[in-house]
Amino acid sequence: FTIDEQLYETLANDQAFYLRAEPLRHPLIFYLGHTAVFYVNKLIVAKVIEERINPHYEALFSIGVDEMSWDDLNDDNYDWPSVAEVKAYRDQVRAMVDHVIETLPLALPIDWDNPFWAIMMGIEHSRIHLETSSVIIRRLPLDQVRPLPLWEICEESGVAPQNQLLSV
């Protein structure tokens, strides 16, 4: 949760969350909510929790896009909540996930029949979106982002190495 939120601190203002930097993706407000919703939805399916935190958000932020023409990217079809509301929701989800991690009996191995599998999926899913969201943020106009020490600019450059195919 923390590193996701630190990534979004690079946005200069709340309006940046609602810009569509990548035409085939939702605005960043979706991804801020999506990674938290993923935990809730997976923990419900795994029968680790029984009640949703915010059923409206858990529908709104559940399904992303696959860069296909039939994906719903019409902004008129979405009434995105405020950044503060989504952050408050994330805080609730984080408290619930922390409680699950602290109280759910851990049995090894963690495979897909293990309730902890949903937590592992949530962690992996968040890491994937950390990467994709960082790419979307890099496509924003420069006045919509700000530098932060955690996300230093890479000063290294050079010629790309020559790749070669290896026999397998």
Give the residues covered by each predicted segment.
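Short, contiguous alpha-helical
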Residues: 9, 15-69, 106-166
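Acidic/histidine-rich alpha-helical segments that form the ligand environment
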Residues: 63-108, 117-121
